[in-house]
């Protein structure tokens, strides 16, 4: 059963959009990357349920956006505190957590500061501390966001993320779509991008005690493959 559901939490820290789908006994929490600053999970329950339908029998899946109104200079650790509050509100005492890119940075802090919440952890294409590659990417995206260049951000992200064939497809798609999906404000994106550039959980990784899988790519042009290796070396018993 897909059981897609769109929801919004009214927390002490502010409102937060989330989606839920699946009917399994196990709970999986998914945390998207910095693109959440451009488009949240609001209204995406059915598309996510269809995309990840293989999970819906074993898991009840939750995907959380960052809260709607972000404070200036919020850190990934602050965002992990918001996530903990959201899980508390939904009575999710313990879950498997999958964090992708910036979502992986938030997941690291959740596992460090609230280990009772995290049963198992998957960290995909993410990092534990800044490096020159991610600083350069974020600087480019920040400059584009400041001048409202939504299409530029999407194309640059695609060119750093995909094979040449996929890049050609992305160029064609964004050429046709133009500014479809462009947010009214880039403020959330800028705050999230800054939090990626300042994220540093490296020295705390050894405090993560749950079973952990790190997924990375040797040709990663955003966070680098070395970043995944660094994480795996620091977390006890981690698999890469």
Language-model-detected regions and their locations in the chain:
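Conserved alpha/beta-hydrolase "nucleophile elbow" surrounding the catalytic nucleophile
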Residues: 95, 99-104, 217
């Amino acid at each position: 059963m897909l059981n897609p559901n769109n929801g919004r939490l009214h927390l002490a820290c502010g409102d937060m959009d989330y989606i839920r789908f699946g009917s399994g006994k196990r709970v999986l929490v998914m945390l998207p990357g910095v693109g959440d600053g451009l488009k949240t999970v609001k209204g995406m329950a059915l598309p996510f349920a269809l995309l990840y339908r293989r999970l819906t029998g074993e898991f009840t899946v939750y995907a959380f956006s960052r809260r709607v109104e972000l404070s200036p200079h919020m850190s990934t650790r602050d965002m992990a505190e918001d996530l903990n509050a959201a899980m508390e509100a939904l009575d999710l005492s313990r879950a498997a957590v999958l964090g992708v890119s910036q979502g992986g940075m938030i997941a690291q802090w959740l596992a460090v500061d609230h280990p009772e919440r995290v049963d198992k952890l998957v960290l995909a294409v993410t990092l534990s501390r800044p490096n020159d590659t991610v600083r350069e990417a974020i600087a480019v995206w920040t400059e584009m966001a400041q001048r409202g260049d939504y299409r530029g951000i999407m194309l640059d992200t695609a060119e750093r993320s995909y094979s040449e064939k996929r890049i050609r497809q992305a160029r064609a798609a964004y050429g046709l779509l133009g500014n479809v999906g462009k947010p009214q404000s880039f403020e959330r994106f800028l705050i999230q991008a800054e939090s990626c550039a300042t994220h540093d959980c490296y020295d705390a990784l050894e405090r993560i005690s749950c079973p952990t899988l790190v997924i990375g790519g040797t040709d990663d042009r955003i966070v680098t493959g070395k970043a995944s290796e660094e994480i795996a070396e620091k977390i006890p018993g981690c698999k890469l």
